[in-house]
Regions:
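Low-complexity, intrinsically disordered regions enriched in charged/polar residues
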Residues: 14, 28-32, 75, 79-83, ...
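Mature extracytoplasmic domains of secretory-pathway proteins
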Residues: 49-117
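Long, low-hydrophobicity ectodomains and other hydrophilic envelope-associated domains
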Residues: 1-69
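Generic detection of short hydrophobic beta-strand segments and adjacent strand-loop junctions
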Residues: 119-121
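Generic hydrophobic segment detector
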Residues: 1-9, 14-17, 84-88, 124-127, ...
């Protein structure tokens, strides 16, 4: 089941829909063994392949393993929820840079949009429920900065 935070409830009033993409990460499990996720609902893509490739800048400033890297981060969706982007960025950082394993669990992610607005993510804590349904037009992402500590 999908729990819809905030104004997402007003977007989805019907019992069933077609053409939706649901990014499901188990958030809760109730006493009847039903799995729940929060947010993560968008319309299906109209196109296939890479839609957006904002620059992903990653830096670790302290220690002997300090580094700065920048490269395109490929997004294959026209719209992506903050929940899915957060999950995929963390997965990328775990696989490529040992986040939560070999380097500190501390760090921040800043997702900057072309209109000047941005989202900040704290790598020490889980994305808050109220932001999980936030939808971003992937072509509007200017860049993504990751600062590992």
């Amino acid at each position: 089941q999908v729990l819809l935070p905030g104004n997402d409830k007003s977007k989805f009033q019907q019992r069933s829909y077609e053409g939706l993409d649901v990014f499901f990460v188990q958030e809760k499990r109730d006493k009847h063994d039903i799995f729940y996720t929060v947010g993560g609902v968008i319309q299906n893509n109209k196109t296939s392949g890479v839609v957006s490739a904002p620059i992903l800048n990653i830096s670790k400033e302290k220690g002997e393993d300090a580094f700065v890297k920048g490269y395109p981060y490929y997004i294959k969706k026209e719209k992506i929820t903050l929940k899915e982007l957060d999950y995929k960025l963390r997965k990328h950082l775990i696989e490529k840079y040992g986040l939560y394993k070999t380097i500190s669990k501390d760090g921040r992610v800043k997702i900057s949009l072309k209109d000047g607005s941005f989202y900040n993510l704290d790598l020490r804590s889980k994305l808050k429920f109220k932001y999980m349904g936030e939808v971003i037009e992937s072509k509007q992402i200017k860049d993504i900065e990751v600062n590992l500590k």
